[in-house]
Amino acid sequence: MTTEQTDIMDKIQSFRPHLKPSTIKQYYHQLKKLQMRLKENDFEFLMNADDTIQKINKLTSDKNPSELLHFTSKRNIYNPVILYLLALDKDKNVIKKYEVERDKLNNQYQDEQLTGKISSKQGKNFVHIDDIIKMITTMKNELKPKLKTNMNARDIALLKAYTLFEILVRFPTRNDLAGLQLITPSKFKKITEEEKKNNNYIVRAKPNSYFVWNEFKTDKKYQSISENIPKDLEKIINTYIKINNYKSGDIIFDFSRNGLSQILLNASGKYLGGIQLSTTMIRKSYLSSKYSD
């Protein structure tokens, strides 16, 4: 690990102490990738927000260089950029420019989700919700005999993917599960509004645990939404928490939004014969099923 990487990761850790090193490392690598793609020597280029935003808008896809970068990929660039600048206490006016761009892309994403419309590009990865549920059942049956044994890393990875899919077919959010923090009701009452605004939570309470979603809106439209977790899903999540020995305050899905996407894409690709499901496609399958009648 270079001195630069250590210094940046330490500053982000101090700014967001609840983030685990693996998540911060992912953010750093996203920043480094942007720096390399724009052929810059350091991160000072980020201080020229107008020029950087213009260059990001011209970036092309890694998989298909003839296509511009998808808007969700651009959004995922802005999140670590904003976090980095906040952690280093940089000019708030510069940060605001990046936040405006990110929020535009968030709004674009939300508008697409409300329509449930499937683009030609997404069509090849569209599956009916029943097929997703069958996939989840296959995962469940594969996991069942392993839950009472010493699970290896591959088993734990499958449990993580299974738990994510079980949540997403009931709560078809965006990638807001990334960085989800486990917390008790008493501790949740003590956290500041600023902390609530920048994180999403699973609150373990009686008689019902519940999710608190805070990152799905722009600052101007900010509000908090709580959703009770059904008992059958709560049991699945509790199993995941117990096996991983998570405690209050821990991040139970310790990966970036891009990391979450990769988990879903890889797992679904294996169980659906190469069809790869993102949170977007799960949501579209959910909406298609819900409003098909």
Question: Which ranges hold each PLM region?
Answer:
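N-terminal DNA-binding module of tyrosine recombinases/phage integrases
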Residues: 1-14
